[in-house]
Amino acid sequence: MTELLPLNTSPLPVKLRVEDYLLLDESGAFDAYRKTELIEGEVYFMNAQHRPHARLKSRLHILMAAALQKIDANLEAVVEGSVAMPPNNAPEPDIVITSEAEGDGLIPFASVRLIIEVSDSTLAFDLDEKLKAYASAGVPEYWVADVNAKVIHQMWAPEGEAYTERREITFGEPVDATSIEGLSVSTASL
């Protein structure tokens, strides 16, 4: 059966699907841009990471890995692993907590328990577009580590394009995950 498309009187953008994005990536279409990610069907070029961002991400990864090991949760903290969130998202968060770190291709969405973004110049984007994409997909918990304000925005209970629960934790205070029982991350060294 042929699907009839509505008559458009003006041009409309086309959102890329994850499979379109992967084909373009594999063909080398994004080689000149170093790193990209797909958010709501649009391809975004990712900025270079300066020392404050890189340092915070590195320390947070070490702390998260140690905290996961303590609770023996069969989960792993993966740095900069792209996540398949069909149909229109393939983000590359700073840290992904997943039960399927091994394997080929993108991290399967069903394995994701928590996503962490480290933000300096990207704070507005991470708390708006990325938050909507993660909540819409049903990411159980989302943290945004704000380099400049020295806080972690912790969000959980996704509903539609938002998280219904959130709190702000100052660096130095522990962060208790809501989606992973027993997981508490010390932020004293951040």
Protein language model features and the residues they cover:
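Gly/Pro/Ser/Thr-rich low-complexity, intrinsically disordered segments predominantly at protein N-termini
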Residues: 1-190
